Amino acid sequence: MINKTRHNARRYALQALYQWFFCETKPDALISQFMEEHDLSDTEVAYFKEVVTGTIQHVAIIDELMTAHLDRKISALNPVELSVLRLSIYELLHRKEVPYKVVIDEALELVKEFGAEAGHKYVNAILDVLSSEIRKGV
């Protein structure tokens, strides 16, 4: 069963990170703008803020972890899939209370909704390997 408010937080976080991909706005400004433009009443707002800020703050480490498992340069990734991967890797690293299967399932739902037709297969393959590496022993 999906936690709807947490799912919405991830959904909006993906949209914010996608926007950040193109304009690299500072996290606080991006979050403020996003909250002004969207109704987040059905969303876990604190989680939204944390994952957006945290993903942006740790993007270099996240990208480094991801790059080892890509079959192409990071710049060649679809921006939606890249944003989903970054968000999910942040959760795997910093939200250990969230089961890795939930992180992957949520990522796949987001890619199916916003990404390319077969993008979920690519994202699943990368997150499957990374979740084992990041969460080993957890």
From Swiss-Prot:
Transcription regulation as UniProt keyword: yes
The protein, known as: Transcription antitermination protein NusB
Family: Belongs to the NusB family.
Coiled coil: none
Pfam families membership: NusB
One BP annotation, GO: transcription antitermination
Taxonomic classification: Bacteria, Pseudomonadati, Pseudomonadota, Gammaproteobacteria, Legionellales
UniProt KW keywords: RNA-binding, Transcription, Transcription antitermination, Transcription regulation
GO-annotated molecular function: RNA binding
Function (record text): Involved in transcription antitermination. Required for transcription of ribosomal RNA (rRNA) genes. Binds specifically to the boxA antiterminator sequence of the ribosomal RNA (rrn) operons.
UniProt KW Transcription regulation keyword: yes
Record-linked PANTHER family: ANTITERMINATION NUSB DOMAIN-CONTAINING PROTEIN, N UTILIZATION SUBSTANCE PROTEIN B-RELATED
InterPro entries: NusB-like_sf, NusB_fam, NusB_RsmB_TIM44
Entry GO terms, CC: cytosol
